[in-house]
Amino acid sequence: MTQLFDTLGFIEASAVRAGAGADAVAHEEAVTPVGGAAVSLEQVGKVFATPRGQAAALRDVTLDVRRGEVFGIIGRSGAGKSTLLRLLNGLERPSSGRVRVQGVDVGALDEDGLVALRRRTGMVFQHFNLLSAKTVFENVALPLKIAGVPKAERVRKVEALLELVGLAAKRDAYPASLSGGQKQRVGIARALVHDPEVLLCDEATSALDPETTQSILALLADINRRLGLTIVLITHEMEVIRAVCDTVAVIEQGEVVETGPVWRVFGDPRHGATRALLSTLQHDLPAELAARVRPLPEQAALPDGAQIVLDVRYTGESGGEPDVGALAAALGGSVRFLHGGIESIQGHAQGRLVIAATPRADDAGPSTARGGAVAALLERARRHANHAEVLGYV
């Protein structure tokens, strides 16, 4: 219910009030942005009053979103993601710090200023919140109708948007006949009616099945490319970040704990919260393989014919594809691939290879965990990968 009120309130607040005329235009010119990032947060804090006292939802958040990029904000439930997004569209005011959208200080705006801002800031909500008694066309046209836009212009604009989101054939359908993905496409079209410069997405795919999620993310990416639109989306799913975002910020207990290009954050996560979120994408060894891997002996030599199991990881820092042949040649002897794979994120190849390698006979010392051939093998692996560690032997 709260999201429904937010949706309707946002639609009404983003409409130019009928009869405002030249005053509204003049005020919009007064808040026209000049240069800089599309979205900027400077040491932003947000405190709410609770029966138990003050509760900090956000603490000292500093972020910059470049114009034209897709910026993802991810965190667990209650981390502060939705509060942050509500600050960007003026549904909440910061308790401290400064929020700028298109160069405009959101916290300093009066109601007229917020109207002008929201015309340039579209909003896609988690729940579709469509009016059941209105058709697809009427739902998308509603903000324009409230704004007093002439009918002919409304028709032109809405039909173009329905074509953009792939719903031209559903123009006269009612929400009850639509799938979840189609309903969200209506929500996206509605968010674009005022030609916004920034699109805010609040868990826009969390109510959808995986296949539909991918289609909506593909639509957002297409809109970003076609319109040059800056998109800020919040999610709790790393798959969403990987699929569509250029940059990601990880938020934990109201603080931004890590930020960077998606390929870097995925390939080399530096904070525990990031690693925890990524754990759902990083599969453990298959049970059958894990049962075969034995821990290295502390003192005794390895059994004859044993191979060292290495976990080799590529973070994408080199930019090119890993030279697996060079790795195998450096390790020497018999090298077997046991598990893993390589994928490309933003043109950076990264992934994990679990391999079994035979220590070379010319490496000095016994093949134990304390040095000798195992240490030499590990050192050679590290020369050809970003990270490598010994898991045991088979």
Swiss-Prot record:
Q: Which residues form the ABC transporter domain?
A: 39-278
Q: Where is the signal peptide?
A: none
Entry keywords, A to Z:
Amino-acid transport, ATP-binding, Cell inner membrane, Cell membrane, Membrane, Nucleotide-binding, Translocase, Transport
**Residue positions binding ATP:** 75-82
Catalytic class of the enzyme = translocase
Q: Which GO terms describe its cellular component?
A: plasma membrane
> One short Pfam family name for this protein?
ABC_tran
Q: Give its E.C. classification number.
A: 7.4.2.11
The record's annotation in Gene3D superfamilies points to:
3.30.70.260, P-loop containing nucleotide triphosphate hydrolases
Record's bilayer topology term: Peripheral membrane protein
Q: In the record, what terms sit under GO molecular function? A: ABC-type D-methionine transporter activity; ATP binding; ATP hydrolysis activity
Subcellular location field: Cell inner membrane
What job does this protein perform? Part of the ABC transporter complex MetNIQ involved in methionine import. Responsible for energy coupling to the transport system.
Q: Which family does it belong to?
A: Belongs to the ABC transporter superfamily. Methionine importer (TC 3.A.1.24) family.
Q: What is this protein called?
A: Methionine import ATP-binding protein MetN 2
Q: What is the lineage of its organism?
A: Bacteria, Pseudomonadati, Pseudomonadota, Betaproteobacteria, Burkholderiales
Q: Which gene encodes it?
A: metN2
